[in-house]
Amino acid sequence: MGQENGRDDERPAHRVTVAPFLLCRFQTTNAHWEAFRKATGREKVEFAHETAPAAWVNWFDAMAYCHWLSAEWGMRGALRARLPTEAEWEFAARGGVEGRLYPWGDAPRVYQARRWKDGPEPVAGFEPNGYGLFDMCENVHEWCSDWYDAGYYAVSPAENPQGPAHGVRRASRGGAWRHHVKFSRCAARSSIPPEFRYADYGFRVGGEAVKEAI
């Protein structure tokens, strides 16, 4: 996890083990968000493309969606929805290839002059990574569950790191439609205060089996 020749908060590179977890193949879309909004009575949000990732979502919004989805899943099975940790997200982004810079390889893609210049693209417009996950490291920044600490890697546990116990900013991962490709690297870290909403911030649902139901 991390990149030794990356930015300061990506060092030191270190080996991490994560327990089995689930991660949605797609970023949460406007269509998904609209179902949540209708079910919970939230204010309607205008959007152009229902298959584009839901944006203008803060960390608390994303957590509320996960709690709602957990209740929906609880009616059908034994899964709990949640945001992924930074460690889980980076593991998933690499697609099974250790040390890979980007989900698709070690060089930036050529398509940086994108078709959609004023917002995120519909999901799954390009090939998935080795784990079948679409748009890892692109389209919108994705919220993680962790608090952010630039020096956390120096003290991070080797198994299932959850991030620091407290902080001011929440961690996010992945590149976005309006940011330089440097944020699209698997190891790149970003963060903002959890109450902030931006046009290039969304999320991807993670999950795990509920032990009591196994």
Describe each PLM feature range:
Residues 8-11:
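C-terminal, low-complexity/hydrophilic appendages and adjacent surface loops
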Residues 23-26, 160-162:
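Short, mixed-charge, low-aromatic patches
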Residues 21, 28, 34-43, 69-76:
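Short capping motifs at secondary-structure boundaries
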Residues 15-20:
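A short N-terminal beta-strand-loop micro-motif at the entrance of redox/enzyme domains
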Residues 2-6, 43-190, 194-199, 206, ...:
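Functional-site microenvironments in short loops/helix caps that host divalent-cation chemistry
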